[in-house]
Amino acid sequence: MNSIVSKYTQSTNNDDPKKIIEEEGFTNRFDVVPVPQSSLYLRNLTDETKNKHCLIKMNHGTTTLAFRYQHGIVVCVDSRASAGPLIASQTVKKVIEINPYLLGTLAGGAADCQFWETVLGMECRLHQLRNKELISVSAASKILSNITYSYKGYGLSMGTMLAGTGKGGTALYYIDSDGTRLKGDLFSVGSGSTFAYGVLDSGYRWDLSKQEALYLAQRSIVAATHRDAYSGGSVNLYHIDENGWVFHGNFDVDSLIWEAKDNENSFAHIPR
């Protein structure tokens, strides 16, 4: 009993937080393979362009999109997870709710995106506690891009968007596993992004109403799921304004296709 009391009643002034975290087994780093050049070793195992006999083939696909307009930001994604030619799941949540004001999307390797965006969430919370204010989307995106750049060449697979509001207002950024960081008003990432862009480019404008923006995002994902075998399942729809993000629902792709066929006279090649 005395040992328990002493452990949890010591003054924190002399405690080293980093040491405590490492002793408890928690860390925001991961170990690399103990070989002379870890990046080359991992690339040889995962990069099919460098080694056609590679043991780990990172085949994946998805469709995610986000865009800014006059009333905020819309984020929309599908829910299919693929493992090469196989459908691993139809109910994957590809929007990571980092905090009530910031969302991250998932494209590429699910584990990489989930792990590092969880780490980002901890960093954002620490910033808020230290500075008594929300972190800006720009600063959050810079943290994530610095992390991914530090592991460039080590086999990470990430193509994520960060959308949110904070100090500096609403903003949208694209970050990938090479450390690339781009600010923009419209992005679509994943194997189905070409099809999503086809709808977005024809319907996007800055002065969209909120309902028009939500429908455009939803309709773009539907088009991508129809043409891209690696996208499908259902559509998850979010909206962000100065008060934070709001989840607008999960919608079945098949139902949305039939709805578009009836209301727009589109998908005419699909027989009843």
UniProtKB/Swiss-Prot annotation:
Its EC number is 3.4.25.1. Gene3D superfamilies: Glutamine Phosphoribosylpyrophosphate, subunit 1, domain 1. It comes from the Eukaryota. It is an enzyme of class 3 (hydrolase). The active site is at T62. This is Probable proteasome subunit beta type-5. GO terms for cellular component: cytosol; nuclear envelope; nucleus; proteasome core complex, beta-subunit complex. PANTHER family: METALLOPROTEASE TLDD, PROTEASOME SUBUNIT BETA. The proteasome is a multicatalytic proteinase complex which is characterized by its ability to cleave peptides with Arg, Phe, Tyr, Leu, and Glu adjacent to the leaving group at neutral or slightly basic pH. The proteasome has an ATP-dependent proteolytic activity. Residues 1-61 form a propeptide. Keywords: Cytoplasm, Hydrolase, Nucleus, Protease, Proteasome, Threonine protease, Zymogen. One of its GO terms (biological process) is proteasome-mediated ubiquitin-dependent protein catabolic process. It comes from Schizosaccharomyces pombe (strain 972 / ATCC 24843) (Fission yeast). The 26S proteasome consists of a 20S proteasome core and two 19S regulatory subunits. The 20S proteasome core is composed of 28 subunits that are arranged in four stacked rings, resulting in a barrel-shaped structure. The two end rings are each formed by seven alpha subunits, and the two central rings are each formed by seven beta subunits. The catalytic chamber with the active sites is on the inside of the barrel. The keyword Signal does not apply. It catalyses: Cleavage of peptide bonds with very broad specificity. CDD domains: proteasome_beta_type_5. Pfam families: Proteasome. GO terms for molecular function: endopeptidase activity; threonine-type endopeptidase activity. Its main location: cytoplasm. The keyword Nucleus applies. It is found in: Cytoplasm; Nucleus. SUPFAM superfamilies: N-terminal nucleophile aminohydrolases (Ntn hydrolases). Belongs to the peptidase T1B family.
